[in-house]
Amino acid sequence: MSKIYNNLSIETLIKTAWFNQFDKNQKYEIMKGIEADLDVSHYSYSKFDWREMEQIRLGLEDNLDVSWYADPKYSWFQMEQVRLGLEDNLNVSIYVEENFNGHQMEQIRLGLVDDLDVLIYAKEEFDCVQMEVIRDGLENNLDVSVYANSEFDWEQMLCINEGLKNNLDISIYANPEIPVEKMKKIKEKLLRKNNSSSKFDFYKNQIIAFFNY
């Protein structure tokens, strides 16, 4: 343990008042960084808790530009979303420079990973669950413009999303003024009607095939 840091050996460093301002977990993160030859000056501040320190340390280990997120205004989870985005060479500016919480950032990052048009839902007006339902629609090539509206809550969005997946006439219930329970009943009624039509068409085709045999 003779390594030197800022002209101090580790043995001397750990005895300083500066080092002892940190709690046990923060000290661990600082020591991990020093042992890995990292520039711990990016995170060796008491304003960062140990989980935030960890995210900055992991970014430094991967040679990432931690200046994107080494800021106490971000929670550790927000920092993680930025770090993971940088690892994947994503355009993290889409979600770093806005007032998104960590879970919103996660949904935007996941959309960027899948090369989706995240600008459709990368808006503060959507919470993370609404974002997830819109992202799911984009992944399934649905016309999300029908429900990418903050006037719909996430359950209403999901009802419309499921209707689109089942080729239902969602125009009947895609209205934010319709309560979600009523939406569900309309959706189920349309599903039953579709299933009945499908069964009828199946048996009709079987009969036609039989007589044409």
Question: What residue ranges belong to the model's regions?
Answer:
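General marker for long, soluble alpha-helical cores
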Residues: M1-Y213
